């Protein structure tokens, strides 16, 4: 079954009908059970991760990857954080097309004000799998940075979620950590997100 799907990760993101189609010995009932089990596991992982502080872009990737990297349309969301960088809630901002999504800074910042968030992380996926930022991504990041300063809300990062490749299991781009390394503020024992 895993071999037919290509990988366990690919299998986990298939609909029940797709699972039944790739394996002749599995009917719709068993395929639906498998699909439900994968979804339950993904939800349990997100719940566990949501209790821990989000300190690095890798933490963002770990939290969002099961929900975002297999989406076929660009999806923009914000992770609202408290003063200890724990997740208050994720908020979906927009769903776009295969290669773009429209998000305005006011739509991105509105949930931070409504939910009284200390800060936020902007995130979106690239359905192509390549997390390299586009010029549009660069411009949006700069506009959101400027607007968040005016509102006094901490814009902690913009993370683009890609898909795993042959050379890396965690494929993402972070505007604050372009190399993906865990950076610390100069002279302090805390991560950049704090």
Where do the language-model regions lie?
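Divalent-metal-activated hydrolytic enzyme cores
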Residues: 95, 142-194
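Long, charged amphipathic helices and adjacent flexible linkers at domain junctions
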Residues: 44-64
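Short acidic, glycine-rich surface-loop motifs adjacent to enzyme active sites
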Residues: 118-131
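Long, highly charged, low-complexity intrinsically disordered interaction regions
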Residues: 1-22
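Extended, charged alpha/beta regions that create polyanion-binding interfaces
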Residues: 37, 42
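Charged helix-capping and loop-helix junction motifs
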Residues: 104-106, 135-143
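Histidine/lysine/aspartate-rich catalytic loop segments that bind and position anionic ligands
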Residues: 58-115, 119
């Amino acid at each position: 079954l895993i071999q037919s799907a290509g990988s366990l990760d690919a299998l986990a993101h298939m609909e029940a009908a797709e699972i039944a189609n790739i394996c002749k010995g599995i009917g719709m009932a068993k395929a639906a059970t498998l699909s439900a089990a994968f979804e339950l596991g993904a939800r349990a992982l997100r719940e566990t991760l949501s209790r821990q502080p989000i300190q690095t872009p890798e933490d963002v990737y770990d939290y969002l990857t099961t929900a975002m990297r297999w989406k076929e349309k660009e999806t923009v969301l914000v992770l609202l954080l408290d003063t200890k960088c724990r997740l208050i809630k994720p908020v979906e901002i927009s769903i776009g097309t295969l290669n773009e999504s429209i998000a305005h800074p006011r739509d991105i910042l509105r949930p931070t004000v409504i939910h009284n968030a200390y800060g936020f992380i902007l995130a979106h996926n690239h359905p192509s799998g390549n997390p390299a930022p586009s010029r549009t991504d660069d411009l949006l990041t700069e506009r959101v940075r400027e607007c968040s300063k005016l509102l006094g809300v901490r814009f902690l990062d913009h993370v683009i979620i890609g898909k795993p490749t042959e050379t890396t299991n965690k494929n993402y781009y972070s505007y604050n950590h372009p190399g993906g390394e865990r950076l610390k503020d100069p002279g302090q024992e805390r991560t950049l997100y704090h």
